Amino acid sequence: MMAGGNVRFLVLILAVAICGAASVFQPISDSHRSAALDVFVPVDGSYKSLEEAYEALKTLEILGIDKKSDLSSKTCENVVKVLQSSSSTLKDAFYALNVNGILKCKIGEAGPKDIVSQLQAGVKDAKLLLDFYYSVRGLVLAKEQFPGTHISLGDAEAIFRSIKSLSQSDGRWRYSSNNPESSTFAAGLAYETLAGVISLAPSEFDPSLIQSVKTGILKLSDSIQKYDDGTFYFDEKSVDASQGPISTTASVIRGLTSFAASESTGLNLPGDKIVGLAKFFLGVGIPGDAKDFFNQIDALACLEDNKFSVPLILSLPSTVISLTKKEPLKVKVSTVLGSKAPALSVKLTQALSSKSVDSSVINNQELKFDADSATYFLDSFPKNFDIGKYTFVFKIVLDESAHEKVYITEAQTKVPIAATGAISIENAEIAVLDSDIGSVESQKKLDLTKDGAVSLSANHLQKLRLSFQLTTPLGNAFKPHQAFFKLKHESQVEHIFLVKTSGKKSELVLDFLGLVEKLYYLSGKYEIQLTIGDASMENSLLSNIGHIELDLPERPEKATRPPLQSTEPYSRYGPKAEISHIFRIPEKLPAKQLSLVFLGVIVLPFIGFLIGLTRLGVNIKSFPSSTGSAISALLFHCGIGAVLLLYVLFWLKLDLFTTLKALSLLGVFLLFVGHRTLSQLASASNKLKSA
């Protein structure tokens, strides 16, 4: 029997390798919705801050997940508290209004007026870009949520110019006038802020101001980064290392879409960059970080609802086509959030083989449409379509010309495709040859689709030859990614050899005379195993062919010995043996009684010192009598006692570094109080002498 489990594992690994290399972009799907519930998890019915609450609620709202009822109670309490407090920061007020726009919290009548007044004061006093951003965008939110409140910026052009003064010549912006460094992330905030100023202005703006901003946007777009697959993104340079490509690109997209939403701006961006930015966020996959998750979904929502053009994404449920199962090619077209696309047609303009990129196997083939599954498919392939790697080139054509102003697609979408099938294995044989004349001594036909029981014998003067032919379903030569021949000695020593392929024939010749050292001069029975695998090969195999008895010369004394083999092949993955450390045997210690006597001899002088003090008496006449001097002297003696206590602790339990740290602090303390005490004693002595 063939080792089916190993073969299935081999095929799985190869399939994953191909799929992982494919540059295929998928729209937002149920996997994102499932992941969002794991990423945005509230604690006790709320989030740590209103900023986190807004990002979670906004993401879940875009994905169509209703969690408002679970979060509205505690979160609304925080919103009302912030909006009714005069001491709330502009940032807190901004995020409170964002959350309120989703949860529709019940705010008192005085709340809107108070928060509007606070935000208007924030606009007037703002010097930093973030202060302008929070206050202006907060007023825009307040205008949307409180229709009865009149909100406008009387000096809108002056505010616009103040914000514009923070711009740089390369299209990036500064956070403040005192900071010369510019930021791409700040540019996105600035465009959002300027869009808010335009929407709150009581009259039309000076066109030259808007044109100057549009010029800066064009310069900023020149700094956009690009991958080979047509993906575009913005990245921060140096001013704010905490902002990565995801947050920076999301900030710019929010700013551009907000600025373009104003009718007076007339802003437009090239379609290829819109699609490239969408592909960047779709290529991220599912972020594990909550901030990145929010930026991804929010940026895609901005691209899906913008004044430029809505990008359409072509995706494939699978990039592997089985010719054996006659599977059709399936293609889907949708918006970035997975919404239904308008009426259109999909053409397969080219199918380029990796073996011949100059000629196309398929040309201008229009795919059929299945309305029930909203899938475009190609259910038949030309006769010359063989297994292998291809690059399919698709083109999307909108049915109605009016949709061309609303939607945008790539001019060409290139997708790597792997066509798989069953490989024919023919003329498989194994033979023992004489080394001198190359004549066949024994030869066996093989059926590699199943295990065999071939029995061969050879000596060190002979050769072993294995040969077979691999052909595709169309009869073309096939060269597998992996073709290994293994000899396994009865002592479990293994040797692996690579089978080379030339044309249609794969062959391996082992000259045992040149392999005796590699085989460690081990005579005896060797099991023969052949492994053939390829990502395009559906019938990859691991076949046990049989065995061969080898008669090799005796091993010389200086020859390399075979490595020790475990009786259990999988024991290498089990627990390792415990490592036992052998320490140096401690030196012999003196008797306990002798140690105690020695300790007594050391302590004896100290005892004598104490006895002498009791006999002579302690002279404390010079101890300061005034309160300040007495405290300094007392602290000095306490510090000396603390040092002595530290020595004892060092002897008993503390390490050297901890002791030195404590001693340095005590030393500074003793230096201060000791100097003060000595100064006071010297002053008192001088007074006595002068008297």
Curated annotation (Swiss-Prot):
Disruption phenotype: Short pollen tube growth and failure to exit the style. Residues 22-593, 652-653 are lumenal. The keyword Transmembrane applies. InterPro entries: Ribophorin_II_2nd, Ribophorin_II_3rd, Ribophorin_II_C, Ribophorin_II_N, Swp1. Keywords: Endoplasmic reticulum, Membrane, Signal, Transmembrane, Transmembrane helix. One of its GO terms (biological process) is response to cold. One of its GO terms (cellular component) is cytosol. Residues 1-21 form the signal peptide. The chain crosses the membrane at residues 594-614, 631-651, 654-674. Pathway: Protein modification; protein glycosylation. It is found in: Endoplasmic reticulum membrane. Residues 615-630, 675-691 are cytoplasmic. It comes from the Eukaryota. The keyword Ribosomal protein does not apply. Pfam families: Ribophorin_II, Ribophorin_II_2nd, Ribophorin_II_3rd, Ribophorin_II_C. Disulfide bonds: none annotated. It is a multi-pass membrane protein. Belongs to the SWP1 family. Subunit of the oligosaccharyl transferase (OST) complex that catalyzes the initial transfer of a defined glycan (Glc(3)Man(9)GlcNAc(2) in eukaryotes) from the lipid carrier dolichol-pyrophosphate to an asparagine residue within an Asn-X-Ser/Thr consensus motif in nascent polypeptide chains, the first step in protein N-glycosylation. N-glycosylation occurs cotranslationally and the complex associates with the Sec61 complex at the channel-forming translocon complex that mediates protein translocation across the endoplasmic reticulum (ER). All subunits are required for a maximal enzyme activity. Component of the oligosaccharyltransferase (OST) complex. This is Dolichyl-diphosphooligosaccharide--protein glycosyltransferase subunit 2. It comes from Arabidopsis thaliana.
